[in-house]
Every structure is written in C-alpha cells, then in structure tokens.
Amino acid sequence: MSNAITMGIFWHLIGAASAACFYAPFKKVKKWSWETMWSVGGIVSWIILPWAISALLLPNFWAYYSSFSLSTLLPVFLFGAMCGIGNINYGLTMRYLGMSMGIGIAIGITLIVGTLMTPIINGNFDVLISTEGGRMTLLGVLVALIGVGIVTRAGQLKERKMGIKAEEFNLKKGLVLAVMCGIFSAGMSFAMNAAKPMHEAAAALGVDPLYVALPSYVVIMGGGAIINLGFCFIRLAKVKDLSLKADFSLAKSLIIHNVLLSTLGGLMWYLQFFFYAWGHARIPAQYDYISWMLHMSFYVLCGGIVGLVLKEWNNAGRRPVTVLSLGCVVIIVAANIVGIGMAN
C-alpha cells in the first residue's frame, strides 16, 4: 500500500473522528432550544467556515465562482441540499427507531448508496467488477457493511441491557425515515462527484491538491444551509414553545457559553469534511468513490470508541462490549482490504 493511500485512509479516519465527536459540545448547551443551538452551529459550519477558507485559498474569490455555468453549480448545490434533508431526517430516525437501529439502518444505506451509485452514474461499475483491484475494493465495502451491522447489534444489546428505548418507537415510520435518511445523506458523495470541475479549476489556479475540494464547499454546504436553517427558522417562528428572542434574553454569561459551545460543535462538524477533502485528494481517481465508504464506516468505528472512552458502555455488560470490539475490528479490516485493492 502506497504512502499516499495510507495517508488518504488516515485523513478519512481523522475526519470521521471529528464527526463522531462534534455533538459533544452541543450537549453542554443550556436552556436553549435545539433549533437555536443548531442554527448557531450551522451558520459557523455551513456558511462562515466554507466562505472564509475559500477566500484564503482562492486568488480571486468571485472570479472563481462566476467562471462556472449554472449547469455546473446547480447539481452541486442541489446535492448539498439533498444532504441537508438527510441531516434533518437523521434526528427523526433516532426518535422513532432508537440510536442503534436508527444508525445501523441509516448508515448502512448511505454507505451502500453513496459508495456504489457514484461509479454507476459515471459508467465505471463494470470496470470495478472486471479488475482485481476493483473487486478487492468492493469486497472491502461489503466487509465494512458487515462491520456496521455488528456494531449496530452491539448497540441493540447495550440498549436492551440498560433499558434504553426509542423516544416514540414506531417501526413503520422509523424505517421509512431511516431509508430516506440513508439515501439523502449520500448527497455529499454525489455533490463531491458533481463538483469535480470545481476541483480541477481550483487546481489550475495553483491551489494545493489537498485543498482543491474546499472551495466547492461554499456551494455544497450552501445547499445544506438552506435546508437546515430554513427548517430551524420555520420552527422557531411557528412553534409556540420556541423563541429565538427568549433564548437570547438569558444571562449574558450563559449566552456567551452557549454561543462558544455551539460554535465549537459547528467547527468540529466542518472539520469532518475538511479532512474528508484531504483524504479524498489522496485516494486514486479511479477509486474516489471509496472515500464515502471510508468516511461512514470510520464514523461508526469512532462513534463506538468515543462511547467507550466516555464510559457510555460501563453498565452494558461484557457481551455488548465484546460485540462492539468485534465490529470495530471488522471495520478496520475492511479499511485495509480497500487499501490493498486501491494499491492494485
């Protein structure tokens, strides 16, 4: 396995670790509605950071974006909005199915859809099946899916042992939302594929290969921002129990506390895709579809490890922890299989 591929896998791991941890600061926000908290974090992650970093990278910010036709920008924006819908559905999926089943189904579907649809859309799937390296990477995707399933099973055992139940368990509604979440969340993978002309243009301007995907985030995350912020602002305006004014009428020290934590959460959310771009840049072009599989499977892996570090599994007993550990090992094996396949 080449150093470039190894570093690509490593950066995807770092990005996934940030994704697994990003909600921790949000949990410490006090006396704010979820909508206010999510909006503040979202403004940081979807608007401020993509624009600021692109302004630093590009020699002429406005000239870069104005050089693209609407036919190039619109699919990138819409796939970003698609991912934003997936974000909203994610929370509802957890509500009706519970964490373990919800994450298992949603992540499993988005891993398959986001990974395999890209080469199918590009007309390259037959090449993957007909080459040794392609078959090896597809095997890695299958093994990763098995690993996600094992970690999901560990979560179910943990919830059963600790008596944790879904907020409003509804299997039919939850399954529909989980499938929708999985499909729509894959929008980020599709957006990155659609944004290739933007990446090439950034490279032509002398942007470092590690950073060429970052300017496209202005458009991708702009689509996500419209959906997420629109959802939050509509609820803040229409739901009687929610009030943006009330949330910002608290003690000044508490407002600063909440803004800083929400900002940190937004920063960590953005960093998952900052390092995703770094990892994506190191993956061989013919296997760039694998980036999504690495990100999502490492997200599950890191989520399990973070749960162990935070002692969330302390009262779950030995069997759930053993199953979780097995799932994590399987995901690591999957990453190595994919790496070997890409090296071929």
Curated annotation (Swiss-Prot):
The keyword Signal does not apply. It is found in: Cell inner membrane. The chain crosses the membrane at residues 4-24, 38-58, 68-88, 101-121, 137-157, 175-195, 214-234, 259-279, 290-310, 323-343. It catalyses: L-rhamnopyranose(in) + H(+)(in) = L-rhamnopyranose(out) + H(+)(out). Uptake of L-rhamnose across the cytoplasmic membrane with the concomitant transport of protons into the cell (symport system). Belongs to the L-rhamnose transporter (TC 2.A.7.6) family. This is L-rhamnose-proton symporter. It comes from Escherichia coli O9:H4 (strain HS).
